[in-house]
């Protein structure tokens, strides 16, 4: 519902702040003697479609060959826009009070809340059988119920997620295309499985897929799981992070 969204899509993590920061960097580099002692060239770039949202739409673009990757950063590199770059620095908004801890790693809450986790992007499709909800519900298989059961099973897994892995599973239901008096025969879900390491992401994603599949079996429904690589976990260089904090 953002007033400047295009086709219902807009960035969600303060990209206006990132753009302002880039303009500030450009202005600083134009100051007298700012580039003294430096060689080479400096390129200021922004990454469009950086957030991995609208997964079904992006997967459609990928299937058509319009894009190769669902994430803007990965697509950016694939198209060669960082070719010839020897060193890159990223500017992004942060939670107030976040910092590098004594072990040289980012604080745990910062790692989780700032989205620095890696992720697997998931498209989930439950397939049931439509029937008249009032007259013959026994002839249908409710895809919505199967999806709800699958999400409940995933919620019951949360106590098995270890805090050190900062696992996050946050699905959204994409809705059913049917009337109120019809047993829904399809329900789509989009989600991520996020984590602090690739090992943790893969391990917990297996659990999630098992829960989603088990729910379909218990209801006599079908389920299609499509997992696509998202972003790898991000780790900050502690020395450079400290330098950036001191400069601020």
Model-predicted segments: where are they?
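Histidine/acidic-residue-rich, glycine-tolerant segments that coordinate divalent metal ions
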Residues: 2-10, 16-17, 36-169, 177-181
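Short glycine-rich or small-residue beta-strand-to-loop segments that form or flank ligand, phosphate
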Residues: 9-12, 192-194
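Ordered, soluble secondary-structure elements with a strong preference for glycine-centered loop motifs
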Residues: 11-12, 137, 198-203
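Active-site alpha-helical elements of protease catalytic centers
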Residues: 12-29
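Short alpha-helical patches at coil-to-helix transitions and adjacent helical residues
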Residues: 18-23, 144, 237, 241
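Amphipathic alpha-helical segments in well-structured domains
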Residues: 22, 42, 69-73, 205, ...
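Flexible, small-residue-rich helix->loop connector segments that border functional cores
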Residues: 24-41
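Metal-dependent amide/peptide-bond hydrolase catalytic core
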Residues: 148-248
């Amino acid at each position: 519902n953002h007033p400047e969204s295009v086709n219902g899509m807009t960035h969600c993590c303060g990209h206006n702040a990132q753009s302002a920061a880039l303009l500030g960097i450009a202005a600083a580099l134009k100051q007298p003697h700012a580039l003294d002692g430096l060689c080479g060239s400096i390129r200021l770039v922004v990454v469009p479609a950086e957030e991995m949202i609208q997964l079904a739409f992006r997967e459609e673009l990928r299937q058509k060959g319009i894009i190769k990757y669902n994430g803007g950063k990965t697509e950016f590199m694939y198209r060669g826009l960082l070719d010839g770059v020897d060193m890159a620095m990223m500017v992004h908004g942060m939670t107030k009070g976040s910092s590098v801890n004594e072990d040289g790693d980012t604080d745990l809450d910062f790692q989780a809340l700032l989205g620095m986790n890696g992720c697997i992007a998931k498209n989930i499709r439950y397939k049931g059988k439509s029937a008249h909800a009032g007259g013959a519900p026994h002839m249908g298989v409710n895809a919505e119920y199967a999806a709800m059961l699958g999400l409940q099973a995933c919620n019951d897994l949360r106590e098995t997620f270890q805090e050190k892995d900062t696992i996050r599973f946050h699905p959204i239901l994409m809705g059913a295309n049917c009337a109120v008096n019809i047993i829904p025969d399809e329900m789509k879900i989009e989600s991520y499985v996020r984590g602090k390491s690739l090992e943790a992401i893969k391990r917990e994603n297996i659990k999630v897929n098992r829960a989603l599949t088990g729910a379909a079996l218990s209801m006599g429904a079908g389920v299609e799981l499509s997992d696509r690589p998202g972003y790898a976990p991000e780790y900050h260089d502690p020395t450079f992070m400290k330098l950036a904090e001191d400069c601020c």
